[in-house]
Swiss-Prot record:
Protein name, as recorded: Small ribosomal subunit protein uS7
Hydrolase as UniProt keyword: no
Origin species: Rippkaea orientalis (strain PCC 8801 / RF-1)
Alphabetically ordered keywords of this record: Ribonucleoprotein, Ribosomal protein, RNA-binding, rRNA-binding, tRNA-binding
This protein's encoding gene: rpsG
PROSITE patterns: RIBOSOMAL_S7
Family as reported in the entry's similarity comment: Belongs to the universal ribosomal protein uS7 family.
Protein task: One of the primary rRNA binding proteins, it binds directly to 16S rRNA where it nucleates assembly of the head domain of the 30S subunit. Is located at the subunit interface close to the decoding center, probably blocks exit of the E-site tRNA.
GO term, biological process aspect, one: translation
InterPro entries on file: Ribosomal_uS7 (IPR000235), Ribosomal_uS7_bac/org-type (IPR005717), Ribosomal_uS7_CS (IPR020606), Ribosomal_uS7_dom (IPR023798), Ribosomal_uS7_dom_sf (IPR036823)
Length: 156
C-alpha cells in the first residue's frame, strides 16, 4: 500500500435523466466489462417499471430503498494477541451508501426472474418495503455487530 498520503476523491457526476448521483453510482455498480450504456438501460428500465407498478415517483422509491439498506454498524476483524475479534464499528455515510448499493445489485443479480431490469426493480421495491435479500443482509450485519458488542472496546 502506498504511504504517500490520501488520494483526492473525485465527485460522482449526476445521471442525465434523473439528475441523481445515487442513480449514477448504481449504474456504475450494475455495469459489467465497461458497458455503461447497457447498464444505464437496465437501470432506467427498472425505474420505469417501478413507476408503473407503484404509481409513485421511482426516484423517491429508490432513495427510500437505499435509506433502508444503509447499515449503521458493521464488524471488522481485529487481531489481538493471537485471537481475532469481530469488532463492531460505526459506518461512515459514504461507505454505508456504497454497501447498500453493492448489496442491492448483488441480490438483484442472484434473484430469480427474466431480465436484470425486472430483477433490479423487484429488489428495489422489496428494499423500499423492508423485505428482500439485501434487507436480510443489512439485518444480518446489524445482528453480528450486536452479538459482538462486548469487543467494542477494541475499536481502532
Amino acid at each position: 500500500m502506498s504511504r504517500r498520503g490520501n488520494i483526492k476523491r473525485r465527485p460522482v457526476p449526476p445521471d442525465p435523466v434523473y439528475n441523481s448521483r445515487l442513480i449514477s453510482m448504481t449504474i456504475r455498480r450494475v455495469m459489467k466489462s465497461g458497458k455503461k450504456s447497457v447498464a444505464a438501460g437496465i437501470m432506467y428500465d427498472a425505474l420505469t417499471s417501478i413507476g408503473e407498478k407503484t404509481g409513485s415517483d421511482p426516484l423517491e422509491v429508490f432513495e427510500k430503498a437505499i435509506k433502508n439498506l444503509t447499515p449503521l454498524v458493521e464488524v471488522k476483524a481485529r487481531r489481538v494477541g493471537g485471537a481475532t475479534y469481530q469488532v463492531p464499528m460505526e459506518v461512515r455515510s459514504s461507505r454505508g451508501t456504497t454497501l447498500a448499493l453493492r448489496w442491492l445489485v448483488h441480490y438483484a443479480r442472484i434473484r430469480g426472474g427474466r431480465t436484470m431490469s425486472s430483477k433490479l426493480a423487484n429488489e428495489i421495491m422489496d428494499a423500499a418495503n423492508e423485505t428482500g435479500g439485501a434487507m436480510k443482509k443489512r439485518d444480518e450485519t446489524h445482528r453480528m455487530a450486536e452479538a459482538n458488542k462486548a469487543f467494542a472496546h477494541y475499536r481502532y
